Amino acid sequence: GINCVAAGISNMMNTPIEVLEMSFPVRVEEYSVLTDSGGAGQFRGGCGARRVWRVLGNVTRGAVCCERSKSPPFGLAGGQAGSPMRISLEDPDGGIRHPLSKGAFTVPADGRIVFEVPGSGGYGPASERDPASLADDLKNGYVSEEAARRDYGIKS
């Protein structure tokens, strides 16, 4: 599948880091592809993304309205589910909170918002994945060696 997709529907914008940092009192500390987040399958599901924002200056209120936190994106025709949506709030004192997937929250100055966008489900049995495609997945960091062994039956 396609990784870290933004769609022109709903609230699925992929706002550039520079725009976020110029528009809001945040610093983007991480924006990465989530390894092993796409469901295993003959056709692997697209990987989700991990985004980490640090709140600068003052206490900030935010809101979230996300799906697939309780039931991850499903696989089809024998493919496995993708990873679920996750959000956590890291306070400067080390405390971690997990807000609901729909609602408002407060983050103190210097706190972090960690948001993991779900991966999509795979299609078809993982045992039928093309070995060259799986090798590319490993090389690109989309699939870990552990997941290749567990989900695709690759011997190390």
Give residue ranges: language-model regions.
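Glycine/proline-enriched, intrinsically flexible loops and inter-domain linkers
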Residues: 1-156
